[in-house]
């Protein structure tokens, strides 16, 4: 997997950046990479599975949107849980190891109902092929369709199970971050309001580097948008949220020798923040050419802790986050906000 990511994003990044999250996949299927060698990553809503985690289903169960009532929680007329909807990225799955760990942290610490959207075929993970990385442009195009699926599922939660939008947050990694943004746009179009929060974990860079708000994750897609940047090669290196955390300057991460490792670290960092064993502190950082404010000078009104409580801090903008190599990754000099 790491080798494939490196090949895709280092060797083909310039080609892929000509693609975009199109409404019409015909453009992408007729693209320069489609010459009979690309996998068929065509999106079909029927292929999507929902991995549902709760305290009585800690290992998760697999459901389809059409058969939710097979799980007793969805036999109720109202769901009162806080809900986290997880959306994976390219070549991944809804129950990948890192998402599974995050889901279990969410149900253990905060009793969330966690729903991980598995769109693996549309993300080109359903194939045992050496050229599946060439399906990236199709996966990019599929993000809008998956976003609409998530929005439609949200409508079901709101209207059938009386879940307020203020109880729903989306957490997306890589392409899943932009998918979350498209879902956020769609629920507003459906006049459902805004999600409480979207957390974009190293939002994908290739094919999104020059995109404006309508075609990527944007700070207007939820009441609060938090972005955690960990790879300048695989992720976007510009602000997309209410707060943008640049971990280790957002370039590469301690202990990582490959871009895919840094890209994935965003998921691991958030999981540790959910566990609340420590606070990864973001200190104001205006630009790459400026010096971040020292952590020792941090106060609650100027700095922000990464994670589910970030919205409780008043500061917004760009933040530098120092981290250690090993979990729980704290490098906060004993400062508490």
Swiss-Prot record:
It catalyses: a 1,2-diacyl-sn-glycero-3-phosphocholine + H2O = a 2-acyl-sn-glycero-3-phosphocholine + a fatty acid + H(+). GO terms for biological process: killing of cells of another organism; lipid catabolic process. Keywords: Allergen, Cytolysis, Disulfide bond, Hemolysis, Hydrolase, Lipid degradation, Lipid metabolism, Secreted, Signal. Pfam families: Lipase (PF00151). Its EC number is 3.1.1.32. CDD domains: Pancreat_lipase_like (cd00707). One of its GO terms (cellular component) is extracellular space. The active site is at residues 174, 202, 263. Expressed by the venom gland. Disulfide bonds join 41-124, 213-218, 256-261, 278-305, 279-330, 298-303. The keyword Nucleotide-binding does not apply. It is found in: Secreted. Residues 1-21 form the signal peptide. Catalyzes the hydrolysis of phosphatidylcholine with phospholipase A1 activity. May act as an allergen and induce hemolytic activity. This is Phospholipase A1 1.
């Amino acid at each position: 997997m790491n080798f494939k990511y490196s090949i895709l994003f280092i060797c083909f990044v310039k080609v892929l950046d000509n693609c975009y999250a199109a409404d019409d996949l015909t453009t992408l299927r007729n693209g320069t990479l489609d010459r009979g060698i690309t996998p068929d990553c065509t999106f079909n809503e029927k292929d999507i599975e929902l991995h549902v985690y709760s305290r009585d289903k800690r290992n998760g169960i697999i459901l389809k949107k059409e058969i939710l009532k097979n799980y007793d929680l969805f036999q109720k007329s109202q769901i009162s849980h806080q809900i986290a909807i997880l959306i994976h990225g390219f070549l991944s799955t809804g129950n990948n190891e890192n998402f599974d760990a995050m889901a279990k942290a969410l149900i253990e610490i905060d009793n969330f109902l966690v729903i991980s959207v598995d769109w693996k075929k549309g993300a080109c993970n359903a194939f045992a092929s050496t050229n599946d990385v060439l399906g990236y442009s199709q996966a990019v195009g599929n993000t809008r369709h998956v976003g609409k699926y998530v929005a439609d599922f949200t409508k079901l939660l709101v209207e059938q199970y009386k879940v307020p939008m203020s109880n729903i947050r989306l957490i997306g990694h890589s392409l899943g971050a932009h998918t979350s943004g498209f879902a956020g746009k769609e629920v507003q179009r459906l006049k459902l309001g805004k999600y409480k929060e979207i957390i974009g974990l190293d939002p994908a860079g290739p094919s999104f580097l020059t995109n404006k708000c309508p075609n990527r994750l944007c700070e207007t897609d939820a009441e609060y948008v938090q972005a955690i940047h960990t790879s300048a090669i695989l992720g976007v290196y510009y602000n997309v949220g209410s707060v943008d955390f640049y971990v280790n300057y957002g370039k590469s991460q301690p202990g990582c020798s490959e871009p895919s490792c840094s890209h994935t670290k965003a998921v691991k960092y958030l999981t540790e923040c959910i566990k609340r064993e420590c606070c990864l502190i973001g200190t104001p950082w205006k630009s790459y050419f400026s010096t971040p404010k020292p952590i020792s000078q941090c106060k609650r009104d100027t700095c922000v802790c990464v994670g589910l409580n970030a919205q409780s801090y008043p500061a917004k903008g760009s933040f530098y986050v120092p981290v250690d190599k090993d979990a729980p990754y704290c490098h906060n000099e004993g400062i508490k906000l």
